[in-house]
From Swiss-Prot:
GO molecular function: crossover junction DNA endonuclease activity; DNA binding; magnesium ion binding
Record's signal peptide: none
UniProt-listed SUPFAM superfamilies: Ribonuclease H-like (SSF53098)
Protein family: Belongs to the RuvC family.
Organism of this sequence: Pseudomonas putida (strain W619)
Protein encoded by which gene: ruvC
One family name in Pfam for this protein: RuvC
Protein name listed in UniProt: Crossover junction endodeoxyribonuclease RuvC
HAMAP family in the record: RuvC
Length: 174
């Protein structure tokens, strides 16, 4: 059994999802959103860092998947997204989690079967795979999808690749 944290980073809303990976698949543990409000950027980044740190302390995941930054139309938005991502990554690194990064296309492919899936299709597959009866918030749904993608990728790497990386004290990069 492995607890996996998925993070959908954002400078205003960061989604998180925690799943338990077992021999039979994945089970839902928790999900939600870290809302930073509209303060100064450094204050919002601190909220993301503390929020992710609290989630890690509460649930005890051993690994984290996080979405890569995509090039947005607005360069300022892409920079802020990258900074929020960095705050989440530092929180996970401080806690000793293994960290893997995935593109949005990789996440959609792993969860919905096509890299061109829309948010609604991804959410419906997340609900189906985790046997959820209510729709999660969209950012939480995306984070759960990232956690599921990470679980799927991990299961294809175990036992050889991940075990080797862990033994050598290295970081697994996907």
């Amino acid at each position: 059994m492995t607890l996996i944290l998925g993070i959908d980073p954002g400078s205003r809303i960061t989604g998180y999802g925690v799943v338990r990976q077992t021999a039979r698949g994945c089970e839902y543990v928790a999900s939600g959103c870290i809302r930073t409000g509209s303060g100064e950027l450094h204050e919002r980044l601190q909220i993301v860092f503390r929020g992710v740190s609290e989630i890690i302390a509460q649930h005890g995941p051993v690994t984290m998947g996080i979405e890569r930054v995509f090039m947005a139309r607005n360069p300022d938005s892409a920079l802020k997204l990258g900074q929020a991502r960095g705050a989440a990554i530092v929180a996970a690194a401080e806690a000793g989690l293994e960290i893997a990064e995935y593109s949005a296309t990789q996440v959609k492919q792993a969860v919905a079967g096509t890299g061109g899936a829309n948010k609604e299709q991804v959410m419906l597959m997340v609900m189906h795979l985790l046997k959820l009866t209510q729709k999660p918030q969209i950012d939480a749904s995306d984070a759960l999808a990232i956690a599921l993608c990470h679980a799927h990728t991990r299961s294809s790497l175990v036992p050889h690749g991940l075990a080797t990386a862990r033994r050598r004290g290295g970081r697994l990069r996907l």
